[in-house]
C-alpha cells in the first residue's frame, strides 16, 4: 500500500507542471518578443565577436560587407519597429549602413535599434505584423551572418 501511495504521489507531482504549462500559454505579443530577444541577442553577440578589421570582409564581391550587413540589420529594426509604433508608415533609412559601418558605429547602432524595438514590443498598440516581420528580417540576416562567421573561422553565438 505504501508503494502504491508513493507511486500515485510521484505521478501527481510529475503531471502538475504539464497542466500548469498549458494554462500559461504566452500571448502572441510575448511569443513574438521572445523570438526578437533571441535573434537580437545573436546579432549583438556576432557584432561584438567579429574583430574591427574584419568589418569590411565580404565572402564574395557581390554582397554586403560584414559591417554593411550588420548595419542593414540595425536599419531594418529601426524601420520595422518604428513603423510598428507609428500611426502611418515611416520611410526606410539606410543611415547606419551608409554612415560608414565601422565596428563601434554598428555595435552602438544595433544596441540603440534594439532598445527602440523593446519599446515597440512592450506596447499593446504596436502592429504585431510589423513586429513579426522584424523577427523574420532579423533572422534572415542572422542566417547570412552565420556564413560570414564560419568563413572567418568564428563560432556563431547560436551554435
Please identify what each model-predicted range represents.
Residues 5-16:
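Bacterial N-terminal signal peptides
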Residues 16-29:
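Cleaved targeting-peptide boundary
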Residues 26-33, 100-104:
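Active-site rim elements
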Residues 33-37, 41-44, 54-94, 125-159:
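Short, contiguous alpha-helical
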Residues 42, 46-47, 81, 113-116, ...:
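Well-ordered alpha-helical scaffold segments within catalytic/enzyme domains
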Residues 50-51:
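Membrane-proximal, proline-rich intrinsically disordered regions
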Residues 97-142:
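Acidic/histidine-rich alpha-helical segments that form the ligand environment
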Amino acid at each position: 500500500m505504501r508503494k502504491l501511495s508513493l507511486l500515485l504521489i510521484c505521478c501527481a507531482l510529475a503531471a502538475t507542471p504539464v497542466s500548469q504549462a498549458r494554462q500559461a500559454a504566452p500571448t502572441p505579443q510575448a511569443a513574438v518578443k521572445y523570438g526578437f530577444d533571441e535573434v537580437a541577442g545573436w546579432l549583438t553577440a556576432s557584432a561584438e565577436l567579429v574583430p574591427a578589421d574584419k568589418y569590411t570582409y565580404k565572402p564574395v564581391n557581390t554582397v554586403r560587407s560584414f559591417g554593411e550587413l550588420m548595419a542593414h540589420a540595425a536599419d531594418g529594426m529601426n524601420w520595422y519597429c518604428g513603423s510598428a509604433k507609428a500611426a502611418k508608415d515611416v520611410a526606410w533609412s539606410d543611415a547606419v549602413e551608409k554612415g560608414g559601418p565601422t565596428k563601434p558605429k554598428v555595435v552602438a547602432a544595433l544596441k540603440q535599434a534594439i532598445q527602440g524595438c523593446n519599446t515597440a514590443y512592450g506596447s499593446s498598440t504596436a502592429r504585431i505584423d510589423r513586429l513579426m516581420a522584424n523577427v523574420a528580417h532579423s533572422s534572415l540576416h542572422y542566417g547570412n551572418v552565420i556564413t560570414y562567421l564560419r568563413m572567418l573561422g568564428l563560432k556563431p553565438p547560436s551554435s
